[in-house]
Regions:
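Periplasmic c-type cytochrome electron-transfer domains
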Residues: 2-5, 18-282
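Bacterial N-terminal signal peptides
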Residues: 6-15
Length: 282
């Protein structure tokens, strides 16, 4: 064999050796383990909602979540945008309810672990978040007086078993809200204060029931989680848990030089904080 051929053979051996399956350092393994869903802590008690972990409240909340009657026109429900087979989002660039909004639908899987809600964090409790789309004219386009009447007519017994007696609604307008149309606001402003407070209480309880249901929506295990569990156990990942060399290199970048893990960390791949990424709004 010529000297050139020998040198070429050595180069090829070195190249092939470099193309082997990448390995993780102990530090990388620790970081990967911290991202596994198995590290997700138990839900903290919701001190703003004493019905948060009441099964009957969650069951009523589930019914309301999927009920198109919980909208002004009877055509849209929470599940219109939060689809059960898409981690409770809809894959659209902008949510479409009664109209088209200017924001993407947020996934609800694991949402109860968040300290604040909406893309801009404008709600600090899950039940307050659940109420907002109900009266948004582009989402469900309803109003709290109409929802209160609807609850009494359709779910009165279930509601009262959980939250206690419903108020007398005989003098409550069919449509009224402090956030609605001009006519709805006028009707709301004409209501006695005590009557408005009773409607607000029922409306708040609607949100608390929906929030109780949403607390039950856990993020599903993914093939990454299975990979991380096998890696932590020292086992060779099998089946869909087996990552390709390209996926492993991508993961090494994610937790290493690319610094993705700086913000996308923890079992839900988020630090639940706000960051200015200098990306213009859609």
């Amino acid at each position: 064999m010529s000297r050139f051929s020998s040198l070429l053979a050595l180069v090829m051996v070195a190249v092939l050796a470099g193309c082997g399956r990448p390995e993780f350092s102990d530090a990388e393994k620790q970081t990967i383990a911290s991202l596994a869903l198995s590290r997700l802590p138990p839900l903290k008690p919701d001190t703003t909602n004493r019905f948060a972990d009441v099964p009957a409240a969650a069951a009523l909340g589930s019914t309301l979540f999927f009920d198109t009657g919980m909208s002004g026109g009877g055509t849209v429900s929470c599940s219109t945008c939060h689809k059960i087979d898409r981690q409770f989002q809809d894959d659209l660039p902008q949510a479409v309810g009664v109209g088209r909004t200017n924001r993407r639908t947020m996934p609800l899987a694991g949402v109860a672990h968040d300290p604040w809600f909406f893309w801009d964090g404008r709600r600090d409790s899950l039940w307050a978040q659940a109420l907002t789309p109900l009266e948004n004219p582009l989402e469900q386009a309803g109003n709290r007086a109409a929802f209160t009447h609807y609850i009494k007519a359709r779910f009165g017994e279930r509601y009262e078993r959980i939250f206690g007696p419903l108020p007398d609604l005989s003098g409550v307008p069919a449509n009224a809200s402090p956030l609605g149309t001009d006519a709805e606001r006028a009707a709301w402003n004409a209501m006695p204060g005590a009557q408005a407070e009773e409607v607000n209480r029922v409306f708040a309880n609607i949100g608390k029931a929906i929030a109780a249901f949403e607390r039950s929506i856990a993020p599903p295990q993914t093939r990454f989680d299975r990979f991380a569990l096998d890696l932590a156990a020292g086992a060779e990942p099998k089946g869909d848990a087996a990552f390709s060399s390209e996926e492993i290199l991508g993961l090494k970048l994610f937790i290493g030089k690319a610094n993705c893990v700086t913000c996308h960390n923890g079992p839900r791949f988020t630090d639940v904080s706000f960051h200015n990424t200098v990306v213009p709004p859609v």
